[in-house]
Amino acid sequence: MLKAGCNIPDVLGNFKYTEVSLHEVDYRVLYTGVASDLKRRIWTNHLHGNGGNSTLRKTLGSLFGYQKIARDKNYQINKKTKFGAEDENSLTAWMERNLLFAYFANDKRNELESFLIDSLLPPLNVEGSKAATLHRVHELRCDK
C-alpha cells in the first residue's frame, strides 16, 4: 500500500486507487499477492530482491523508467530481466520510504487474492486484474 502523502509516477495516466483505512490512517492499495511464506516473500523478494524475482519490483521499476538488463546468464533462454544495481538500490530506498506491507495468514489464499483484486482493483497487479491500467502496465513491464 502507498503511504499517505506518497506518490508514484503516473505514467499510466490517471491512476485510480482504492483506499483502505488501518488504525485511522488511509492507504492507497497498489498491489496484492500471495505466497506460502509472506514474510520471506516481502523481505527477500520485494524489499531486498531484484526486478527479476519480484513482480511488484519489476512493475515499480518500470514506472520509474529504469533500464532493464538480463537477469542472469540464461537470458537468451528465459528472457528474464532485472534492473541495474544502482536502480535496484534506488527502488529499495523508495519502497522503504513510501510503501506499507500488510498481510495475514489465510488457508484460501488464492481465492482471497482473486477477491481482493476484483474488489480493490490494485493498479499494479498484472495477473487476474480488471484495472483500467492493466494494458499500460503490461507495456511498461514488457522485456524488450
Predicted regions mapped to residue ranges:
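GIY-YIG nuclease catalytic motif and its immediate N-terminal context
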Residues: 1-90, 94-144
